[in-house]
């Protein structure tokens, strides 16, 4: 695998390399080969992955046909750092941060 380094920008080249490796499935392969996997365990894992893929495909098909509601998009601003429970900042309240 080869990545060009332009203008001595190593960070950008490293980012490109990681992206290529991710696309090729090298990280997943390394994780799987990190230890020995018995053939029976491999078969069970592959079967579970196939079931997961089939369920995901069926769910997407039902969503496209309108029989299942679409997955709600995340609402930014709620949760950590939202209206409540933050650590001060602008509009923190009458006493401000403690």
UniProtKB/Swiss-Prot annotation:
InterPro entries: Ribosomal_bS21, Ribosomal_bS21_CS, Ribosomal_bS21_sf
GO biological process, one term: translation
GO cellular component term of the entry, any: ribonucleoprotein complex
Superkingdom of source: Bacteria
Biased composition, class Gly residues, residue ranges: 78-98
A single GO molecular function term of this UniProt record: structural constituent of ribosome
Keywords: Ribonucleoprotein, Ribosomal protein
S-S pairs: none
Segments for region (Disordered): 61-98
UniProt family annotation: Belongs to the bacterial ribosomal protein bS21 family.
Stated name of the protein: Small ribosomal subunit protein bS21B
UniProt organism field: Bradyrhizobium diazoefficiens (strain JCM 10833 / BCRC 13528 / IAM 13628 / NBRC 14792 / USDA 110)
Gene name for this UniProt entry: rpsU2
